[in-house]
């Protein structure tokens, strides 16, 4: 089944699965075409500036309110939103990939929270999760009232069956599901593994380009939004809600994926990271990693993001007389990294696809000893092609608080610090 999409980041879209299902000239007619119900889904305040306002009108077979009462849900045991107030270690942390589950596990029950900050009630901060699943969601649907979800597959393809249409993603692609959108996650392969950033703050947008100009980085035209699709199915289902960090379950006698037409700006979307237009130095020095930003969630402080999503894709390094890998760094922001494919150019060993690392505020990090030695003696008169890689970073203004399950995980590499212990002292006061 080949899916079709609309294009353009943040566009006001209009789509219908049946001809004439979208009302003409108004949002809420007295009687909707085909006997549908009109329902508005608001992702921002009514009075948010027009350029930032996100809402969609949905025309559905049954309204979203039609389900039985919610009760606490006992699943999703490893998906957390309470990051506690206990002291956080300043040590650099790294993990090997999650193993695939043995028991039948879907996207919801296969989520493992590795860290986060802030929270849904203050509508600021993030949750950072890894998932490993071996079956599709069956007989259940899910929505997240706490934040939008940025899904980064590392292994296995996913189909996101959402209220607003179908999205297929594979490794090298990402998808964003806005706050409140109901969906079912289906596996298109036997197993699936990847990363999820849960953004409690302002919805993600494209970063400003400044002197770069009107093009480059992630171009708006390359983002894809689903077309209307619906299923008219009745049965005994459950609707799972994530609300203020807790999980709730409501019985529902029909599929909530019953939107026949919709228009607006609050919609899921996908993006192929291979379309990222990378920029960099063509003279000397390695620019700041902000040039690799794909999406950003602004905070109330200008120039300081609630979170940034950046990637380190295949690229050409042409800087002369320059240490080309990412330099040693201590940062006021906190950095969580993952690897989708290949090798990260600052770490020769130990950082595997599906793995993760955390370098919190002011914790030193940088290339390992082997990478430093090789890059220090490389011939920089020749361009260097980095082909076999796709790494990414979730960067936040707040300290990322690792969860107890992340710290106790058998995937944690307790010897991570050793990768820097081989760095030699080269200082010689007699020779500049």
Curated annotation (Swiss-Prot):
Keywords: Dioxygenase, Iron, Metal-binding, Oxidoreductase, Phenylalanine catabolism, Tyrosine catabolism
Chain sites annotated for binding Fe cation: 329, 335, 365
UniProt cross-references to Pfam families, sorted A to Z: HgmA_C (PF04209), HgmA_N (PF20510)
EC number, as in UniProt: 1.13.11.5
Main EC class the enzyme belongs to: oxidoreductase
Active site location: 286
Keyword Cytoplasm in record: no
Catalytic activity annotation: homogentisate + O2 = 4-maleylacetoacetate + H(+)
GO BP terms: L-phenylalanine catabolic process; tyrosine catabolic process
Record-linked InterPro entries: HgmA_C, HgmA_N, Homogentis_dOase, Homogentis_dOase_bac, RmlC-like_jellyroll, RmlC_Cupin_sf
UniProt cross-references to Gene3D superfamilies, sorted A to Z: Jelly Rolls (2.60.120.10)
Pathway participation: Amino-acid degradation; L-phenylalanine degradation; acetoacetate and fumarate from L-phenylalanine: step 4/6
GO molecular function: homogentisate 1,2-dioxygenase activity; iron ion binding
Entry keyword S-adenosyl-L-methionine: no
GO cellular component, one term: cytoplasm
Binding site for homogentisate: 344, 365
Listed cofactors: Fe cation
Family statement: Belongs to the homogentisate dioxygenase family.
Quaternary context: Hexamer; dimer of trimers.
HAMAP family the record matches: Homogentis_dioxygen (MF_00334)
Annotated function: Involved in the catabolism of homogentisate (2,5-dihydroxyphenylacetate or 2,5-OH-PhAc), a central intermediate in the degradation of phenylalanine and tyrosine. Catalyzes the oxidative ring cleavage of the aromatic ring of homogentisate to yield maleylacetoacetate.
PANTHER family: HOMOGENTISATE 1,2-DIOXYGENASE
Protein name as it appears in the record: Homogentisate 1,2-dioxygenase
Species this chain originates from: Bordetella pertussis (strain Tohama I / ATCC BAA-589 / NCTC 13251)
Gene name linked to the record: hmgA
């Amino acid at each position: 089944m080949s899916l079709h999409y609309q294009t353009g980041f943040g566009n006001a879209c209009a789509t219908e699965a049946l001809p004439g299902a979208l009302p003409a000239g108004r949002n809420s007619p007295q009687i909707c075409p085909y006997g549908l119900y009109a329902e508005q889904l608001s992702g921002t305040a009514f009075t948010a500036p027009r350029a930032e306002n996100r809402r969609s009108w949905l025309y559905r077979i049954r309204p979203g309110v039609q389900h039985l009462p919610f009760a606490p849900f006992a699943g999703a045991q490893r998906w957390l939103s309470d990051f506690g107030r206990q002291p956080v270690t300043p040590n650099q942390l790294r993990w090997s990939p999650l193993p695939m589950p043995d028991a039948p596990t879907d996207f919801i029950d296969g989520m493992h929270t590795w860290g986060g900050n802030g929270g849904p009630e203050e509508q600021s901060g993030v949750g950072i999760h890894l998932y490993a699943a071996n079956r599709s969601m069956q007989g259940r649907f899910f929505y997240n009232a706490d934040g939008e979800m940025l899904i980064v597959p590392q292994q296995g393809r996913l189909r996101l069956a959402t209220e607003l249409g179908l999205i297929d993603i594979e490794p090298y692609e990402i998808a964003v599901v806005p706050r409140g959108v109901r969906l079912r996650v289906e596996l298109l392969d036997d197993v699936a593994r990847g990363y999820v950033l849960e953004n409690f703050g302002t919805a993600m947008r494209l970063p400003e380009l400044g002197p770069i100009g009107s093009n480059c980085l992630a171009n708006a035209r390359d983002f894809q939004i689903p077309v209307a699709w619906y299923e008219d199915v009745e049965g005994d289902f459950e609707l799972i809600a994530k609300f203020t960090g807790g999980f709730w379950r409501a019985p529902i006698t029909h599929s909530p994926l019953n939107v026949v037409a919709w228009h607006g700006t609050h919609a899921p979307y996908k993006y192929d990271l291979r379309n990222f237009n990378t920029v960099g130095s063509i003279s000397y020095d390695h620019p700041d990693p902000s040039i690799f930003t794909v999406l950003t969630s602004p905070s109330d402080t200008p120039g300081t993001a609630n979170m940034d999503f950046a990637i380190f894709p295949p690229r050409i390094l042409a800087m002369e007389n320059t240490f080309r890998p990412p330099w040693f760094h201590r940062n006021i922001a906190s950095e969580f990294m993952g690897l989708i494919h290949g090798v990260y150019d600052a770490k020769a060993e130990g950082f595997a696809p599906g793995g993760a690392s955390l370098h919190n505020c002011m914790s030193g990090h940088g290339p390992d000893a082997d990478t430093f030695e090789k890059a220090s003696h490389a011939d920089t008169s020749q361009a260097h092609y980095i082909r076999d890689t796709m790494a990414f970073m979730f960067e936040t203004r707040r300290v990322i608080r690792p969860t107890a399950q992340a710290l106790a995980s058998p995937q944690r590499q307790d010897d991570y610090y050793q990768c820097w212990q081989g760095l030699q002292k080269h200082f010689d006061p007699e020779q500049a």
